[in-house]
Curated annotation (Swiss-Prot):
Extracellular side: 23-652
Spans annotated as Disordered: 1035-1179, 1196-1255
Gene for this chain: ERBB2
Family to which the UniProt record says this protein belongs: Belongs to the protein kinase superfamily. Tyr protein kinase family. EGF receptor subfamily.
Record field: compositional bias (Pro residues): 1146-1155
Organism: Homo sapiens
Disulphides: 26-53, 162-192, 195-204, 199-212, 220-227, 224-235, 236-244, 240-252, 255-264, 268-295, 299-311, 315-331, 334-338, 342-367, 475-504, 511-520, 515-528, 531-540, 544-560, 563-576, 567-584, 587-596, 600-623, 626-634, 630-642
Protein name (record): Receptor tyrosine-protein kinase erbB-2
Active site: 845 (proton acceptor)
Consequence when changing residue 655 to V: In allele B2 and allele B3
InterPro entries: Furin-like_Cys-rich_dom, Furin_repeat, GF_recep_IV, Growth_fac_rcpt_cys_sf, Kinase-like_dom_sf, Prot_kinase_dom, Protein_kinase_ATP_BS, Rcpt_L-dom
Segments of this protein annotated with the region Interaction with PIK3C2B: 1195-1197
Domain Protein kinase stretches: 720-987
Entry binding sites for ATP: 726-734, 753
Length: 1255
């Protein structure tokens, strides 16, 4: 199958101006140099195509013609749309004297509009018989050819051809022809006569004086494209081609673009015009459709009209083919996604497929219309071992039994021997032939072993010829009325070498006697084209079963159609008048006027009605309405099938009365209680207002901050059991342990932070500060405190995180992490930091090592050793000293010790970089002293290989020098939530689709599960439930009992924020910071993360609670299961030792402006963090808490120095937790004399330095 066949045009008729003669438009061919499909009928094929034709819509190919071929049918051709090919002919003349223009819309070998090749015997051939003239083309005789719009000329190997070298081809080529090539061979075997003396310049197409070349370009005056003479007044109109007879665009011999009723135009008139007066688009009565180079009032038959005014063979994208009632076909835009259609060979995904095979036959299952063609070649039934294609089995051909229409052609050159006909296409009605085989045939059957055709439903061959030849067993070819199938006079049947008709008749292979006019597709009454009597289904019959036989029938247009099954057969008369139940003469069972029915309706609901209908049959079989029309609970029926009368019993009345009285009493009691409670509330509020007015002794100075209603759970040491050490530092040790609450038969795995003996009061104070911070947060993505044990050494109890820290997790599972994992973690960290921003908490130490992994899909921010709460009037925090992570800090934090939420954004960008590099060290190999200069010069961390520019640009925005230019955390939440829904678009990991799923464990995780006593444990979040009386203004007596027994009840929360849930501030409730804003415009963290996290604690609320809170989702793209938990207590992650000592840097003394601690607040006042605050310059409040050395986490330790002797030797494990990530801004003094050095000291490790610039 040739792809060029898609461009073949069917035989069509286009009209010239009124009163002018009709222009016959015919199809071209697309065989190129291939041998004819049927050499015996090749000349007949050309004659049928071009007889009387004037415009060839395609290519004019004249090949393999014998010497005696009569080609007079070509003499009317004036225009060719494609190319002209004259090749491999023995004929001496080709009468194309009237051909004026070759447009070259298709080109031979993509370059040539005129190709004349191998016409005649080769030059080295033997001499022909004496007296016989050698065959071959002798003269072109294209005396009228004056225009080739596109393409060149190729004339090669024509030994008898003369005069081709005398033609001035430049004059014929259009001035804009970019392919004006001429390859002309002048070798010939005979002597040529000179041109006639009448020919100027000896330029001619033959030796006659009529064959002189007409020049219409090179002789023109300047500026003319074509002319009729050398004078300036002889110029043709710019829309003319091939010359003219006058200066107007109606005097053209051919049109350059479009012929509109004999006038050459640049465009055809539009179908719609715009009315500037009414501002409306109006139909244009002069509008025309574009068809080839002509403007037509309607698209020719078999073509599709479009809304843009063109005639096409295939509808454009998002359009569908529609057939109007008058039979015209057009393309209509789909109002919704176009319905799926069946494509055939040469279309869409089957464009390069040659034949129907077992590999693609299922593409046609259930298809009624195929847009394309069907071809069956020997390879279809032989199979192809090279492509592992099995042979096509005969039973597989049954998929075509539903086929009714083919828009292309049907070509069959191979068929199973077991099938005597083509009856698998018995329902095929139309072969449109918009695409033709070799540009000529819509139906081709050759070399088959079938005995008859069997195409009993075929009614139309829309275009092209039918070729049936070399089918040695085929009969019934002449019994088909082919003329009734064709749609234009240039179509015909070409048949040769089939079984002789007399042999067929001799063997009884003739049409059935019931076939009208002896027309049939095969033997038997089912193969008739039309029936002489009646048609029942697909079979011709002598009479219908109107008066006898079952089932009874009625006659409609000589078709026998069955009566309805409920019609009673009549003797000697008709039974029905139509197919419906209301068209019966008598009913077989019952009649529910006007329909015959099998039974009367009993409780049947008619269409569009909710009221059932009950009927019963009377003595005559007619359905009558029942006296009672029951609507529900119709159980009891009488002997007629009608509902029995329902009588209410006395017991029912008594029960109804009692229930009514009780309902009234209950409602009265309820209303009385409500009224009494309302009066009590009014009395209580009045008394409280009066007492406040008389007892206030000093004015109120409210801060506007929300009260911190978090609760601290106090645990006893007997409830805790330490299992093994997870890590140690200079100030304490982290244990894996089990919490066994008193009176509860549960074991909860926990992490226990224990301060060392003889630690300084400052260390105790700072671990309590960390406990204060951890207890006050409540987000699914931030670790919270489970409790605190106030023994001689303070112990913090948090939930055990079995997967360890995120930094180790990504390093261990580098090859098993996907883009969705990384983007989900980035989104969850951003949500956690957004929550901390909303509660005015500056973390100051955000890094991958300080993010714990609860599950591969859930991470939490931890390690609040450096975190600081901002007061209600604070916007930033200035640190006094201590150890800080230099390579994660923003530039203003390094230079001015200024920490804000936007400096946390900088750290967030570095954390994302760590994830995207699978745990690489930022600025690895660069000393810490060089980091400030490096950042000020504009250098930043490089783009990770797996990151797209979208993700990297978010990191770059986080590292802007101006903190106000960095994105807010809520913006980062939005960005990474969007990316997490389409992860592979933003993070590119090689072979991600082929890799394993996300890791489910880690080395740290496996080490935590090694102990035998860790079995049968209960997760802390499953154990903790809301406590009683959390927000109750008037707690019940005894509410201060056991801490872990106060979780049995809750109160409700109304909209607007006036009342809050009576829940313990556990993982399910997010208590507000004492400095959190009290305005109504809350954070989306509270609306989303808090609300979702609270759902688990709300399980004990009353069922009428209207709270809109819902659970949060760990994965933004996957709905959260009901059993999924989202909260994890923190577990400190200890990375490899990366600390360095800075012994020469001394701490800064406290500011003398800082005053003593404020007096304790009275009982019942709002809980606030104890703080030592004093106003500084510009009203900035500074916190005198030190940076480092406040917690037992070894990542925050100030390393031991060697400047002075130690009273006690350091522990053996202490150096193992020196962390190079942290920079000691204010190390403790070692007993050496105070240093007066003002600047950057020299240290043992030049990568990490301390700064002593005062704040």
């Amino acid at each position: 199958m040739e792809l060029a066949a898609l461009c073949r045009w069917g035989l069509l008729l286009a009209l010239l101006p009124p009163g002018a003669a009709s222009t016959q438009v015919c199809t071209g061919t697309d065989m190129k140099l291939r041998l004819p499909a049927s050499p015996e009928t090749h000349l007949d094929m050309l004659r049928h195509l071009y007889q009387g034709c004037q415009v060839v819509q395609g290519n004019l190919e004249l090949t393999y013609l014998p010497t005696n071929a009569s080609l007079s049918f070509l003499q009317d051709i004036q225009e060719v749309q494609g190319y002209v090919l004259i090749a491999h002919n023995q004929v001496r003349q080709v009468p194309l004297q009237r051909l004026r223009i070759v447009r070259g819309t298709q080109l031979f070998e993509d370059n040539y509009a005129l190709a004349v090749l191998d016409n005649g015997d080769p030059l080295n051939n033997t001499t022909p018989v004496t007296g016989a003239s050698p065959g071959g083309l002798r003269e072109l005789q294209l005396r009228s050819l004056t225009e080739i719009l596109k393409g060149g000329v190729l004339i090669q190997r024509n030994p008898q051809l003369c005069y081709q070298d005398t033609i001035l081809w430049k004059d014929i080529f259009h001035k804009n022809n970019q392919l004006a090539l001429t390859l002309i061979d002048t070798n010939r075997s005979r002597a040529c006569h000179p041109c006639s003396p009448m020919c100027k310049g000896s330029r001619c197409w033959g030796e006659s004086s009529e064959d002189c070349q007409s020049l219409t370009r090179t002789v023109c005056a300047g500026g003319c494209a074509r002319c009729k003479g050398p004078l300036p007044t002889d110029c043709c109109h710019e829309q003319c081609a091939a010359g003219c007879t006058g200066p107007k665009h109606s005097d053209c011999l051919a049109c350059l673009h479009f012929n509109h009723s004999g006038i050459c135009e640049l465009h055809c008139p539009a179908l719609v015009t715009y009315n500037t007066d009414t501002f409306e688009s109006m139909p244009n009565p002069e509008g025309r459709y574009t068809f080839g180079a002509s403007c037509v009032t309607a698209c020719p038959y078999n073509y599709l009209s479009t809304d843009v005014g063109s005639c096409t063979l295939v509808c454009p994208l998002h359009n569908q083919e529609v057939t109007a009632e008058d039979g015209t076909q057009r393309c209509e835009k789909c109002s919704k996604p176009c319905a799926r259609v069946c494509y055939g060979l040469g279309m869409e995904h089957l464009r390069e497929v040659r034949a129907v095979t077992s590999a693609n036959i299922q593409e046609f299952a259930g298809c009624k219309k195929i847009f394309g063609s069907l071809a069956f070649l020997p390879e279809s039934f032989d199979g192809d071992p090279a492509s592992n294609t099995a042979p096509l089995q005969p039973e597989q051909l049954q998929v075509f039994e539903t086929l009714e229409e083919i828009t292309g052609y049907l070509y069959i050159s191979a068929w199973p021997d077991s099938l005597p006909d083509l009856s698998v296409f018995q329902n095929l009605q139309v072969i449109r032939g918009r695409i033709l085989h070799n540009g000529a045939y819509s139906l081709t059957l050759q070399g088959l072993g079938i005995s008859w055709l069997g195409l009993r439903s075929l009614r139309e061959l829309g275009s092209g010829l039918a070729l049936i030849h070399h089918n040695t067993h085929l009969c019934f070819v002449h019994t088909v009325p082919w003329d009734q199938l064709f749609r234009n006079p240039h179509q015909a049947l070409l048949h040769t070498a089939n079984r002789p008709e007399d042999e067929c008749v001799g063997e009884g292979l003739a049409c059935h006697q019931l076939c009208a006019r002896g027309h049939c597709w095969g033997p038997g009454p089912t193969q008739c084209v039309n029936c002489s009597q009646f048609l029942r289904g697909q079979e011709c019959v002598e009479e219908c079963r109107v008066l006898q036989g079952l089932p009874r029938e009625y006659v409609n247009a000589r078709h026998c159609l069955p009566c309805h099954p409920e019609c009673q057969p009549q003797n000697g008369s008709v039974t029905c008048f139509g197919p419906e139940a209301d068209q019966c003469v008598a009913c077989a069972h019952y009649k529910d006027p006007p329909f015959c029915v099998a039974r009367c309706p009993s409780g049947v609901k008619p269409d569009l009605s909710y009221m059932p209908i009950w009927k019963f049959p009377d003595e005559e079989g007619a359905c009558q309405p029942c006296p009672i029309n029951c609507t529900h609970s119709c159980v009891d029926l009488d002997d007629k099938g009608c509902p029995a009368e329902q009588r209410a019993s006395p017991l029912t009345s008594i029960i109804s009365a009692v229930v009514g009285i009780l309902l009234v009493v209950v409602l009265g009691v309820v209303f009385g209680i409500l009224i009494k409670r309302r009066q009590q509330k009014i009395r209580k509020y009045t008394m409280r207002r009066l007492l406040q007015e008389t007892e206030l002794v000093e004015p109120l100075t409210p801060s506007g901050a929300m009260p911190n209603q978090a609760q601290m759970r106090i645990l006893k040491e007997t409830e805790l059991r330490k299992v093994k050490v997870l890590g140690s530092g200079a100030f304490g040790t982290v244990y894996k342990g089990i919490w066994i609450p008193d009176g509860e038969n549960v074991k909860i795995p926990v992490a226990i932070k224990v301060l060392r003996e003889n630690t300084s009061p400052k260390a105790n104070k700072e671990i309590l500060d960390e406990a204060y911070v951890m207890a006050g947060v409540g987000s699914p993505y931030v670790s919270r405190l489970l409790g605190i044990c106030l023994t001689s050494t303070v112990q913090l109890v948090t939930q055990l995180m079995p997967y360890g820290c995120l930094l180790d997790h990504v390093r261990e599972n580098r090859g098993r992490l996907g883009s969705q994992d990384l983007l989900n973690w980035c989104m969850q960290i951003a949500k956690g930091m957004s929550y901390l921003e909303d509660v005015r908490l500056v973390h100051r130490d955000l890094a991958a090592r300080n993010v714990l992994v609860k599950s591969p899909n859930h991470v939490k921010i931890t390690d609040f050793g450096l975190a600081r709460l901002l007061d209600i009037d604070e916007t930033e925090y200035h640190a006094d000293g201590g150890k800080v992570p230099i390579k994660w800090m923003a530039l203003e934090s390094i230079l001015r010790r200024r920490f804000t939420h936007q400096s946390d954004v900088w750290s967030y960008g570095v954390t994302v970089w760590e994830l995207m590099t699978f745990g690489a060290k930022p600025y690895d190999g660069i000393p810490a002293r060089e980091i400030p200069d490096l950042l000020e010069k504009g250098e930043r961390l490089p783009q990770p290989p797996i990151c797209t520019i979208d993700v990297y640009m978010i990191m770059v925005k986080c590292w802007m020098i101006d903190s106000e230019c960095r994105p807010r955390f809520r913006e980062l939440v939005s960005e990474f939530s969007r990316m997490a829904r389409d992860p592979q678009r933003f993070v590119v990991i090689q072979n991600e689709d082929l890799g394993p799923a996300s890791p489910l464990d880690s080395t740290f995780y496996r080490s935590l599960l090694e102990d035998d006593d860790m079995g049968d444990l209960v997760d802390a979040e499953e154990y903790l439930v809301p406590q009683q009386g959390f927000f109750c203004p008037d707690p019940a007596p005894g509410a201060g009992g056991m801490v872990h027994h106060r979780h049995r009840s809750s109160s409700t929360r109304s909209g607007g924020g006036d009342l809050t849930l009576g829940l313990e501030p556990s993982e399910e409730e997010a208590p507000r910071s004492p400095l959190a804003p009290s305005e109504g415009a809350g954070s989306d963290v509270f609306d989303g993360d808090l609300g979702m996290g609270a759902a688990k604690g709300l399980q004990s609320l009353p069922t009428h609670d209207p709270s809109p809170l819902q659970r949060y989702s760990e994965d933004p793209t996957v709905p959260l299961p009901s059993e999924t938990d989202g909260y994890v207590a923190p577990l400190t992650c200890s990375p490899q030792p990366e600390y360095v000592n800075q012994p020469d840097v001394r701490p800064q003394p406290p500011s003398p402006r800082e005053g003593p601690l404020p007096a304790a607040r009275p009982a019942g006042a709002t809980l606030e963090r104890p703080k030592t605050l004093s106003p500084g310059k510009n009203g900035v409040v500074k916190d005198v808490f030190a940076f480092g050395g406040a917690v037992e986490n070894p990542e925050y330790l100030t390393p031991q120095g060697g400047a002075a002797p130690q009273p006690h030797p350091p522990p053996a494990f202490s150096p193992a937790f020196d962390n190079l990530y942290y920079w000691d801004q204010d190390p403790p003094e070692r007993g050496a004399p105070p240093s007066t050095f003002k600047g950057t000291p020299t240290a043992e490790n030049p990568e990490y330095l301390g700064l002593d610039v005062p704040v």
